[in-house]
Amino acid sequence: VIDDLKTEARKLGLWNMFLAKGHYKESPGFTNLEYGLIAEQLGKSRTASEAVNCAAPDTGNMEVLAKYGNDAQKKQWLQPLLDGHIRSAFLMTEPDVASSDATNIQLSMKKEGNDYILNGQVSTDLVGRGWH
């Protein structure tokens, strides 16, 4: 059923509505206010956000990839997310802090040459299990 809803959403131009046209040429081009009102209605259904490819955490992750991702990251991760073929995750649950607040993360990052070294620990991953 969800695949049929996704097909219909694409036909109606209701796909990836949260992204600006600068990041996604097929975007309906809603303002943040307009999309906020739409998101309020989508939130009344357990499946609506996924049916129009506007479900968290994918929306935020797609925005980050669209704005900051390099070409290889966009090809490997952004395009499949935009197409609705994969789901993503945002992991922030750490064992020593109440990390439902993304600003409370203990993870550290340092630059070494052209690379960034991440040092941290995620205690569990419950995102995306059983979605399909």
Segments (PLM) and residue ranges:
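Intrinsic structural disorder
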Residues: V1, K21, M92-E94
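Internal helix-loop-helix
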Residues: D3-K75, Q79-G84, D125-G130
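Glycine-rich, Trp-frequent "lid" loop and neighboring beta-strands that shape
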Residues: P28, Y68-H132
